[in-house]
Amino acid sequence: MVAIVDYNMGNLASVFNACKLIGVDAHIVSNPDELKNYGRVILPGVGAFGDAMEHLESTGMKKAVLDFAASGKPIIGICLGMQLLFESSEEFGDHKGLGLIPGKVIAFDKSKMNMEEHKVPHVGWNKLFNKPSPLFNTLTNPYLYFVHSFHAVTDNKYIIGRTHYGYDFTSAVNKDNIYGFQPHPEKSHDNGIQILKNFMEI
């Protein structure tokens, strides 16, 4: 069974429907005590980093997610959910994250971008240049759907995917049993569905 974490910040319905499409027994979970009963966790998210961390803390879900990650079972963060995996974010101030992957979340550096060609937020289809990973089984450099104004900065050893938007940025990460994915697989048609299928087999 797969738990989709509900902390009042997620694109829950679309992630749930994508799981249902591939025949996965997924449940939207808001009770942190239940998380340990699942085999995999999806941490979705849409919105501001600081608000998301506040919700995770206030609901008790932060500790539940950290405990789940420590158990060694697979967990994936999607979009804002991926950013929460890192140590900190500079979005609207300085905020601490879950600290599951070393690194931080920063705004797109507009000084490196042609702003006539590259608007922020980064919205739409773009190519993810992937390294070999179980998450990308059968896929090579897939086009996926993005919506974000911030991106992660981390050590190269954790990066399994990069995307170019004015400059190269980190769009997929992996550390042990923990995966992060900046684009939205649930909005990325066949390529995104394949990535969700691959996660279910990890």
Task: List where the protein language model places each region.
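Short acidic low-complexity segments
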Residues: 1, 26-37
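N-terminal beta1-alpha1 ligand-phosphate binding loop
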Residues: 2-24, 185-187
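Short gly/ser/thr-rich secondary-structure transition/capping motifs
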Residues: 21-28, 56-59, 125-131, 162-164
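Structural motif
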Residues: 42-44
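Cysteine-nucleophile active-site neighborhood
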Residues: 47-122
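Pocket-forming structural segment of enzyme catalytic cores
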Residues: 89-167
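C-terminal and late-domain segments of enzyme folds
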Residues: 151-202
